[in-house]
Amino acid sequence: MNNNKVIKKVTVVGAGFVGSTTAYTLMLSGLISEIVLIDINAKKADGEVMDLNHGMPFVRPVEIYRGDYKDCAGSDIVIITAGANQKEGETRIDLVKRNTEVFKNIINEIVKYNNDCILLVVTNPVDILTYVTYKLSGFPKNKVIGSGTVLDTARFRYLLSEHVKVDARNVHAYIIGEHGDTEVAAWSLANIAGIPMDRYCDECHQCEEQISRNKIYESVKNAAYEIIRNKGATYYAVALAVRRIVEAIVRNENSILTVSSLLEGQYGLSDVCLSVPTIVGVNGIEEILNVPFNDEEIQLLRKSGNTLKEIIKTLDI
């Protein structure tokens, strides 16, 4: 797509597992000319920056340095990964009050130096914190984006691809709603080469067993809990998901991604941030699509949204 705006500078707030890995994926991408890493632990950020810079001879030129909030000035995109970590057995919603308080300071500091960037929220619970960011920042709704279910959708497509033995990039399926326990698998639209998933399984003769919708859905929904149980945190795949969103913005691709953003009547939901198929380009949210999900999926999506709205009511924002 034509892109009259050149995006050069990205700031990452938070130099933990997700933030530093995100900086790494952006460094490898060749998309950005300047990456700033901000963290309350300056020593940790310095170490990450040093480690990244030692790989500079292997990538396209990019300036990477540890900064302060004043370095948000001039940033085209500010990615927020900072916040309390999710503990084993803790749901993303359990995190909300702790991270809302953290965000009050972060958003205030960002907008003090930059009120014209795109804010990309990654910290969990991402949908609620995307809404919190929208409210606290005063930014236009198209400039506040959550990573949403981009990762969940990738997990869904990967698991389906493993089952049917097809390249994951050729599996078309979405996880919508909350990035968390009430997320919805949109089976009605899942397809390979335009062939509905169930029909494809009947015709391809590659599947070793009949596809179990519930098994795959539960694997997607519980993936983060299993990874945290095994290694303590998730960061590789989510960093790649963030890179994909940044890529869509930088290249003005008008890509369709399941990012989280403010709904205003779509699917019968308002005043809540949720993930549905959305066109993402240089302006951030270009358009929220009206996708023909079936009635059950719409009802589950509304239930997901209303669950989050009840939690939002308890927050001091």
Swiss-Prot record:
Q: Which GO terms describe its molecular function?
A: L-lactate dehydrogenase activity
Major subcellular location class:
cytoplasm
Q: Which residues carry this modification: Phosphotyrosine?
A: 225
Binding-site positions, NAD(+): 18, 39, 44, 69, 83-84, 122-124, 147
Entry function: Catalyzes the conversion of lactate to pyruvate.
State what protein this is by name.
L-lactate dehydrogenase
How's its activity regulated? Allosterically activated by fructose 1,6-bisphosphate (FBP).
Q: Which gene encodes it?
A: ldh
Subunit composition and interactions: Homotetramer.
Q: Name one GO biological process term.
A: lactate metabolic process
Q: What compartments host this protein?
A: Cytoplasm
